[in-house]
Amino acid sequence: MSSPLIQLKIVYWGPGESGKTTNWKVLKNHPRISRLNFGMSVETTDGRTLWQDSIFLRFDLNIKADIDRYILVTQLTTATGQERFLSTREYILSGADGVVFVADSDPEMMEQNKRSFRELLNFTNTLKIPYIIQLNKRDLDNAISINQFKNGLEIPEIEQDDQGNQIVYEAIAINGKGVLKCFRDIVGLSLYDFFNQK
């Protein structure tokens, strides 16, 4: 008997050049992740995401000590960070089961981080989509402190929320640091919602 199928859509959201496509490429090329297709990336002539990056990934999911087995297919997609393409971002977010907000550690990008985060909250608050925050580019010499970043986004200066979920994930996506953990955790939150809404 074949295992039942679960399908999720995970969207990477954030300001332009914060590292969404870099996260996507790291996961797409990860040796322990099975791809169902080669992926699609629509870019401008200068290499920036015009529409979206998208790929389908497959996982075998075991729950309750191998009693319940599922096939998990995850559509991993990025929303362009360019502000002139706002309407495409809302379209890409439709049907999402979880979102990774990718922020830039450069202090000069804080206004763009705030604008993009507010925009995301406007969409996710009505849809009740779980999200996590990845603070990327932690290797920058002038990287903003975690507390300054949290204050700027008006999020609590605590490590975890009431359910024990991490508030901000540090990452250096260009070398893969923190990328897999963010992905695993947003898939976990999305699956929790999936099973509790059945």
Region locations from a protein language model:
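Conserved G1/Walker A P-loop phosphate-binding module
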Residues: 1-42
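Conserved catalytic network of the ASCE P-loop NTPase/AAA+ motor domain
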Residues: 3, 47-50, 61-69, 90-95, ...
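Switch I (G2) and immediately adjacent beta-strands of P-loop GTPase domains
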Residues: 36-84
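Conserved Switch II/interswitch segment of TRAFAC-class P-loop GTPases
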Residues: 79-82, 95-116, 125-127, 138-143
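Short acidic active-site motifs
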Residues: 84-88, 178
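Conserved beta-strand/loop subsegment of P-loop NTPase cores
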Residues: 98-101, 124-139, 157-170
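Charged helix-capping and loop-helix junction motifs
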Residues: 113-119, 147-151
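Canonical P-loop GTPase G-domain recognition
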Residues: 141-198
